[in-house]
Amino acid sequence: MDKQIIKNIIIEKQIAIPNYKLVHRDFLFGDKSNYILVGIRRAGKSYLLYQDIQTRLNRGEQSAQDILYINFEDERLSSLKAEELGTILDSYMELYPGKQPFVYLDEIQNIEGWEKFARRLADSQYRVMITGSNAKMLGKEMFSTLGGRYIPKEIFPFSFAEYLTYHQVEPGENWEYNQQIKSIISNYFDSYFYEGGIAESFEQPDKREYLNVLYQKILIGDIVERNSIRNSRIFRFLAKKLADSVMQPSSLTRLQHMVKSTGDTISLPALKDYLEYMQDAYLFFPIPNLVSPMTEQATLQKRYVADNGILNLFLFQGETKLLENMVAIELNRRFRNTTEETLLYYFNKNVEIDFCVPSAQLAIQVSYNLNDEATYEREVGGLIKFLKAFPGYHGYIITRDYQTQIMADGYTIEVVPIWKWLLQDNN
């Protein structure tokens, strides 16, 4: 690899990054810790690297020359191999002899075998931050290779609170009693509900087109090409069907039959692989049934889309699906961890509950409204039945706009509009 190309990239970023305009996100990184940031493409991982760099520059903890930032999606590095990664460090040392840089490696999963270089950096006492768009970077095998030298963090698209901050809206205390602030928040939520939290889309003149291009990049670049999928038609069909059915559990057999109905065929092992590829790319995330045996938990799952803006590409008048998907996204943000332990479930045994969080004793139903009697009886009655069977749980119904408190059979159910719930504390 030509060192001069690498030197040019290093200097370009040293000049550019300090001047980037950023919206501060509430992430704290330890001064002496190394991190791997993983999440869906364009979730804001690179911006968190920029934020860390700017924070250190502003504190006087480093100068621009201390920055070694490499984006491995730069086409000038397309031929770089794992055995050449040391050239990056060599190039920096030729520019700045005797300095030990802060190392930022963006989208390094593009380099097969990058783990050994990352481990060597950590062993040599470099402070390193890495980003990637594939969940396998958080897998057990990866941590075995890295030897516990990196702290994993999953990065999600902007929350509604972050979305408001981006648009310079600060609700303040008791905002729900201020009609003017409520009106402003409600208007911004209308956009967030349909367009999602992918930050780069916020300033795009045609947000839908931008999100469609992003979806195609994830589907083709991050999944089909990376995993050498031969029949992309089946893969596209499955992605569309999963988006269409975000509120419904889907078994492998059911999905296989759907594919068969189009005239194509797919084996169950291949189908399982396809679903894992989507999950690894953070396009979808699964939620198992709390009461299912372990084998069923792995197959009979609800699957939700990582961002409402992407989901909305598939829907026409899909407000109910968007509502439940947004609740799933927020619960996943609040209660997901980076181990293999599952914290978020749905419940289906004699009664259907949209979301359960055993660790927080939360049972949540999602309903666009409670206007008709049948909907009211189904949602409230289901929660009461669940609360009787599982003492200590707290019952919620999340709606589009309706708020009240329901007292029934000695139980209290909080009915909360989603835009208010999204701004509440994590409980």
Where on the chain are the PLM-derived regions?
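Interdomain motor-coupling "hinge/lid" segment immediately C-terminal to the ATP-binding subdomain
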Residues: 2-5, 9-14, 141-249
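Pre-Walker A adenine-sensing motif
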Residues: 13-32
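Hydrophobic anchor at the beta1->P-loop junction of P-loop NTPases
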Residues: 37
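Conserved lysine of the Walker
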Residues: 45-46
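Short glycine-rich substrate-engagement loop in P-loop NTPases that contacts/grips substrate
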Residues: 68-98
